[in-house]
């Protein structure tokens, strides 16, 4: 069973030119994945500065959308990403590191979409639980004694932002 949520955000606006997408070429360290699954993510200053540099470079290149890989962002950084999205009018889509709640290891995708509400810049933060976990990912989660969530129904968000559709 599949559930598709269609979200329309600033559909009255259009891109002046073709939208520009920045894909971060960054290393996802196994040590960061493991510490995150244990509930102690790496929130060091150097790591934060690496993300800040990638975002700044993408903005300078004129990106409208910034993509990061799976397991790359601690959820504690999401509020900073949302502020950046709001200020720079850049959508950010990233795979969050595992989020441990009780005995379950969750894997979320976050989509941060800039909006203007009554003349004020803001950002909408959308979390979606990953539907399908890789075999090795399940082994890591179970190896630490946690359960792997199985969403039912599978959920997908179809986002229409400024008349650009993506999921």
What are these regions (language model features)?
Residues 19, 41, 74, 114, ...:
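Proline-rich intrinsically disordered, low-complexity coils
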Residues 1-65, 72:
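N-terminal, active-site-proximal structural segment of metallo-dependent hydrolase catalytic domains
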Residues 45-128:
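Cys-nucleophile CN-hydrolase/nitrilase-fold catalytic domain and related Cys-dependent amidase chemistry
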């Amino acid at each position: 069973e599949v559930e598709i949520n269609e979200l329309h955000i600033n559909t009255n606006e259009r891109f002046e030119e073709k939208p520009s997408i920045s894909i971060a070429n960054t290393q996802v360290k196994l040590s960061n994945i493991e510490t995150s699954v244990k509930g102690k993510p790496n929130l060091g200053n150097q790591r934060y500065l690496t993300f800040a540099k990638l975002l700044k470079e993408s903005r300078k290149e004129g990106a409208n959308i910034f993509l990061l890989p799976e397991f790359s962002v601690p959820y504690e950084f999401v509020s900073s990403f949302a502020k950046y999205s709001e200020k720079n009018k850049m959508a950010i889509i990233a795979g969050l590191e595992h989020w441990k709640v009780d005995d379950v290891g969750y894997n979320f995708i976050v989509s941060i979409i800039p909006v203007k509400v009554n003349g004020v810049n803001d950002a909408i933060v959308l979390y979606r639980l990953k539907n399908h976990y890789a075999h090795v990912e399940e082994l890591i989660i179970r190896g630490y004694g946690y359960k792997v969530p199985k969403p039912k129904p599978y959920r997908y968000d179809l986002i229409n932002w400024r008349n650009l559709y993506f999921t």
